[in-house]
Amino acid sequence: MKLANLATIGAFAVFLAAPVGSLVTMGLDPAAERAITLTELTSAKLLTPNDEKYRNDVARRLVSNSPVGMDAIRAKNALDVKVFGFVNTSQVISGADGWLFYKPGFQNGACMSEHDIGVMLGHVEALRMIAKGIGIDFRMSVSPDKEVVYPEKLGPAAAAATGCKILSSRLWRRIAKTSKSSIIDHFDVMGHDVTDDLLYFRTDTHWNELGKLKAVRQLVFELTGRKVDGPILASGQVMHATDMPNRLLRIDHEEAEETYDDYVSRTFPDDSNQKIADTFILHDSFYGVSYDLLKHVFLNPLFLSYGNENIELEVRNALAKSPKHVLVNTVERNMLSKILHGEMSWTGVLGKAFLDANAKTAGGCKMSDAAKDGLKFENLSKQPSGDFTAGVDPQILVRLAEHGRPCVRISFETAVRQNTYVYLPIKDQVNQNGPYFEGFSLMLTDAPGARDFWLVLPEDFAGMTLRVDPIYSTGTLSHLRIQTGALPSFSPVSNM
C-alpha cells in the first residue's frame, strides 16, 4: 500500500512539474498567446499579499503556454471539435454544421438600450458635422458580426449564448434607418439565400473574399455615388487557415476559399482613374484582412489600425493633412464602446483630434461679440460684479451667423469640475423631443479654471441657434464672453 501511495504521489508530482519543466527545457510554445515576460516573473507584485489575481494569472499562463500545456490544450480542443463535434470555451462556441462563433462578440448576451443607441447614432452625426465644418467628409462603416449575418447557423447552444445580441442588432439598425443615419452598414449588402455562396468563413471571425467584395462595392457607391453592378464570379480557389481553430483553439485547420482575381482586375484595375483619392482609413481587423482589395479602390490611402502604438500622433498627423475623406470602420461588436467610450468619443483619440482640428480652423474666423438679441440665458443670473451664477441646468442659447460656415467662441472661468456641453441644433426634428438631443452634442473639458472653446460648423447651421451648457449645475462663471462670426462656405447650402 505504501509503495502504491508513493507511486501515486510521484505520478502526481510529475504531472504538476511537467508543464514547468517543459517550459524550462524547451521555452514557450511558438503558438502561445499572452506569453509570460521576464518583467512579470520578477515583478514585486508576485510577493504582494493582496494581489492574488496577478499571481493566479501569471501561474495560469506559465503552465498553459508551456509546450506540455499547449499540447494538452490542443489535444482537448481537437477531441472536442473533430471527435465530439462541439466545443465551448471562453472564446469559441460551436454552431450548426461545423460552424464556429466568437463568444466575446455575444457580449454576454447583454441588450443595447434605445437610449444608448440614440446617443451612439447622434454622436456619429455630431462627429460628421465637426469634420464637415473643416471640409472633411467623415463616414463611419460597420462590419457585421458573423452571427448577425448567419443567425441560422448558430445552433441551439450558440443561439442561447447570444442572449440579446441578435435582437439588439435589429433594434439599432431599425433606429438608424428611421433617423437616416449616415453610417455605412455593410450588413445591407450581406443578404443571402441557402444556396448562395458563403460571405463569411465557417470557422473564422471574418468575411471571406466574396464578403469583402460586396462591402467594397458598397463603399464605392456610398463615397462616390458610382454603382458597381454585375455578377461576382470566382476564378480560383485556395486554402485559408482560419483564425478560431488556429489562433484560439490552437489546432490546425484550413477552409477552402474562392478567389476573384479576374473580377477584381477587371472591375477595379490598378490604373483606374476612378480610385477614391485623399482618404484616411482608421480600421480594425475586418478592413485589415481587406487591405489588398481596398488598395484597388482607394488611391494611396493612409491606413491606420486601432492597435497602432502611436495612434494618437498618427491620427493628428493624418487630420493635419486635411484629407478629403476620413473613413472609420469598426466591427459591430465593438461599435457601441468605440463610439461612446473609445477612440471616437470626445475624449478618445479621434474625437479629440477632430475637436482640436476644428478649433484650429475656427481660429482663422473673424469674430465679434455676439449681439444681445442673439443671446438667451436660462438658469444663469448676472451679478453686479459681471459674474454669472448658475442654477440647475444652466444654458446659453447663441444665434449663429446667417451666412457661411458659422463660428463661435465661448470663454469663461469657473472653479467647478463639470464638463461643458455644446448641443448642435436639429433642423429635422422627426422622432426627437425638441431642437436638441443628448447624442448630437460635444462634450468639452471639465477642468477648473479658464476655458476657451472655438468652433466652426458647416453652412447647414447658418442662422440656427446653438445651445451651450457651460456647467451642468450650480456654480459661478467669471469673465464670460461669447463671440460669433463666419468663414466662407465650401459649397452651396445642402439640406441636413
Where are these regions (language model features)?
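Extracellular glycan-modifying ectodomains
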Residues: M1-L397, A401-R409, Q418-M496
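Hydrophobic beta-strand positions in extracellular immunoglobulin-like domains
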Residues: F412-T414
